[in-house]
Amino acid sequence: MEISFDLAKDTANIQERGIPLAFGAVILARAVGEIEDTRKDYGEVRQRAFAEIEGKWFQCVYTLRGNVRHIITVHRINEKRVKRWLSR
């Protein structure tokens, strides 16, 4: 799986959340579920993938650009949110 991300957003994500966007590749490889992000019109289809890694839940938001998964953000999420997604 090929990924890409914006270097400025990577720096911001590390500063704000302590997680590099490259970690999204791990989340995508271990994802237990994905849902389309329909909260608003982003001008592109965005997916939210989530995975449990070392007892913690993470989310990776990405969009497909050709065959490349372009990572938009990566962050921790709580188990309550995961259960809500799995019940859909």
Stretches with model-predicted labels:
Residues 1-88:
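Ribonuclease/tRNase effector modules and their secretory precursors
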